[in-house]
């Protein structure tokens, strides 16, 4: 079952309106977050463990308030959505290859011990790595022409759980022996990071004739970059099972990085940064927390960057109405009556999100996601305006408004491309809507992962940047949650001066920046959801300055 109007954010997903077919739009501490929640389908069992036949049986014993919430959801969601058999379609066929240049076994890495400064022995790399292996293929740059630099591709395998994550690494064009390493993540959830590679910030793009076009403003100009297809069953990644929450995905990413840097210690000594957009506003705080939770690690994490992310729904959802109604710097998309309707819906939405924050329960978080997205994203989406860029209409609803996504998919489905990269699945999809839906019904969408950020700020800098023409994860909401975040530096951050962002030698600014302590917020002008696509030169400028530590706490 594909939910009929889910929103996928190339980085964020939800169900904005179930009544009609529209454009697809893509805890207090880490220990609490790790506890997670059972997927909704797994909760449809009775006391004896027998599957519940339908949602009516699940209501037995619930409070009247909870039942009332779900009565509303039933009006929006087809009964089939709650049928566990519909939750996971058959995965694409995969064929294991054996012509790898390197295979790194997690069990071997886990056996390595070293002596600490005080003389005690400890494992060289913490974490449960025994079930993981990393396969590495040296990519011949001449075969694809994407870039001339050294490249590696391959899979992280979790053999115990039949999970295989695909990655593609590009060395820096400049000084790879000293330049930092960046992990790039798209969101969805369920969208491939190879869309970020070819649509936004990688060494090349793909034109309508499926030809490779060089990108002079690639993020690997001054950094080595890893593009990772995660969670499983996204892009070239595959599994016989599925991942439906952010916490589970974090364990896989930690294992991948640990084994990759073990195989390539020359990169492990460099500074490492995690960057991403949209639903990566969920992923990155969790992934960074997972890495930082391991004292003995070979991942030299120095900062995180989140672009147009969804991180604090309670704060961010308050700013859909202003953005849609002319308060975000662009003309109003909705009329006065629609804006009033959004005003009327907001208190209920905020109450539901607060319920989710307080309880962490699937039964609270799923209604919050569906109601709020229907009430606050749905009206905008039904206008046909691009949810990723308020400046224009959605021109290609079959490709998340961007025809280039279709060209990228066609290119990556060519057999010679898949062979050159060592791909094991039969084909490529830019976004997997099964994963999109499963994360929604896991209750993952409204989880308060922003609560992880204060502890991250104690150790490393955090950059939140936002293109000012995006609707779905708009700059107003991102600015608001950075100012609302409870952390020791809140007062100083909120009163920090706002400065112009300019290219060297330029008279006109391309954005604004505010920084205090380890926290930085940027507004980037004339850019939608995908800032590097809309403003390639400017995004490379702030990336290089960020990696150089310009706004880090001194």
From Swiss-Prot:
SUPFAM superfamilies: alpha/beta-Hydrolases. Disulfide bonds join 191-431, 325-339, 349-372, 356-365, 394-401. One of its GO terms (molecular function) is serine-type carboxypeptidase activity. This is Carboxypeptidase Y homolog A. Keywords: Carboxypeptidase, Disulfide bond, Glycoprotein, Hydrolase, Protease, Signal, Vacuole, Zymogen. Its EC number is 3.4.16.5. It catalyses: Release of a C-terminal amino acid with broad specificity. The active site is at residues 278, 470, 529. It comes from the Eukaryota. Belongs to the peptidase S10 family.
């Amino acid at each position: 079952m594909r939910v009929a109007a889910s929103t996928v954010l190339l980085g964020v997903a939800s169900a904005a309106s179930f009544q009609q077919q529209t454009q697809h739009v893509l805890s207090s501490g880490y220990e609490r977050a790790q506890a997670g929640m059972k997927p909704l389908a797994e909760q449809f069992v009775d006391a004896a463990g027998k599957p519940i036949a339908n949602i009516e049986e699940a209501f037995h014993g619930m409070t009247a308030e909870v039942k009332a919430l779900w009565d509303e959801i039933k009006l929006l969601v087809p009964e089939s959505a709650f049928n566990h058999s519909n939750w996971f379609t058959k995965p694409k066929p995969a064929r294991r290859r054996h012509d790898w240049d390197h295979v790194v076994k997690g069990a071997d890495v886990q056996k390595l011990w070293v002596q600490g400064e005080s003389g005690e022995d400890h494992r060289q790399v913490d974490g449960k790595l025994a079930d993981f292996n990393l396969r590495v293929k040296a990519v011949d740059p001449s075969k694809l022409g994407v870039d001339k630099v050294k490249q590696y591709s391959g899979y992280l395998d979790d053999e115990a759980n039949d999970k295989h994550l695909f990655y593609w690494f590009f060395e820096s064009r400049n000084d790879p022996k000293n330049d930092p390493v960046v992990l790039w993540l798209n969101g969805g959830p369920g969208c491939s990071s190879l869309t970020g590679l070819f649509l936004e910030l990688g060494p090349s793009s793909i034109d309508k004739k499926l030809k490779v076009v060089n990108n002079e403003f690639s993020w690997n100009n001054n950094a080595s970059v890893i593009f990772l297809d995660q969670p499983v069953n996204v892009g070239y990644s595959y599994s016989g099972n599925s991942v439906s929450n952010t916490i589970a995905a974090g364990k896989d990413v930690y294992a991948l990085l640990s084994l990759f840097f073990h195989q390539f210690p020359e990169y492990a000594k460099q500074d490492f940064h995690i960057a991403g957009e949209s639903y990566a506003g969920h992923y990155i705080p969790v992934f960074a927390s997972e890495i930082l939770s391991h004292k003995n690690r070979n991942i030299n994490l120095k900062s995180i960057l989140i672009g147009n992310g969804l991180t604090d729904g309670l704060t961010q959802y308050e700013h859909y109405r202003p953005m849609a109604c002319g308060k975000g710097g662009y003309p109003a998309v909705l009329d006065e009556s629609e804006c009033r309707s959004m005003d009327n819906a907001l208190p209920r939405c905020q109450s539901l999100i607060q319920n989710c924050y307080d309880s962490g329960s699937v039964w609270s978080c799923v209604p919050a996601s569906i109601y709020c997205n229907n009430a606050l994203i749905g009206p905008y989406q039904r206008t046909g305006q691009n949810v990723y860029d308020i400046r224009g209409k959605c021109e290609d609803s079959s490709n998340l408004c961007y025809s280039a996504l279709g060209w990228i998919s066609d290119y990556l489905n060519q057999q010679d491309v898949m062979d050159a990269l060592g791909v094991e699945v039969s084909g490529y999809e830019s976004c997997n809507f099964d994963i999109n839906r499963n994360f929604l019904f896991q209750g993952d969408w409204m989880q308060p992962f922003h609560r992880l950020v204060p502890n991250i700020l104690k150790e490393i800098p955090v950059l939140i940047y936002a293109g000012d023409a995006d609707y779905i994860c708009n700059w107003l909401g991102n600015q608001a949650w950075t100012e609302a975040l409870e952390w020791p530096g809140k007062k100083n951050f909120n009163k920090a001066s706002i400065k112009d962002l300019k290219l060297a030698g330029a008279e006109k600014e391309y954005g604004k920046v505010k920084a205090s302590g380890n926290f930085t917020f940027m507004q980037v002008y004339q850019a939608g959801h995908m800032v590097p696509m809309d403003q390639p030169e400017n995004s490379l400028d702030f990336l290089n300055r960020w990696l150089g530590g310009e706004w880090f706490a001194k």
